[in-house]
């Protein structure tokens, strides 16, 4: 049984708007185990950004516990939180956030500064990560010479630099065209399956979410639904559409007669 890398217990977050209290998260509970790929979905204002900021130790809960690798970050001072962010997490952003004056390799090396690695070790590690995400031969290119999809691959390589406990991905396909969206989500899914990388992803993209193991629907600050993603359903020999039993090699579900692909809207029923 995989151990939890994230445990959230009765999490509440309230903001003050003048003298009025505005609840953003309400009694939320969540456990993510090592090696999981989890998608968090929900409409605007549902609390996704607030939740991601709290998981990422950028914001603090009003009440409740947030345990990252067993450490309660909700009670830690800021001068210790930056070490948690550096050592325990990797971040992937919608807008890539690469430094334009650094090469792809140098962007990946940056999080390793001050972590005890020599410059040659940093360079070797960065080159290995860029090769892993399919960018061999592009490591000396600056961001402006890379496509949007390639820039996001660099960002994913950077997020892995310090072997984090998990990756937080905030709308990682949001600024990409349809082809690059598919390539990036397949890359994340492959990292999860082959490297055991734990990924927590916030997304509006139903097809991206469907490629995860577990999908959570957030509404009004609460998790109101949970569903298996396509990969977990297929792994468990279940149709992703109706949940009926399937066997290896099936292309059509024998129960609902639908193709064995992810439904376009996972929470529509």
Predicted features by range, described:
Residues 1-14, 225-234:
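ABC-family P-loop ATPase nucleotide-binding domain
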Residues 4-218:
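ABC family nucleotide-binding domain
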Residues 215-228:
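H-loop (His-switch) and adjacent beta-strand-loop-beta switch element
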Residues 236, 250:
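Residues immediately within or flanking Cys/His clusters that coordinate Zn2+
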Residues 239, 253:
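Short cysteine-rich clusters marking metal-coordination/redox-active sites
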Residues 243, 257:
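Cys/His-coordinated zinc-binding microdomains
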Residues 258-267:
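Short Cys/His-rich micro-motifs in 6-15 aa windows
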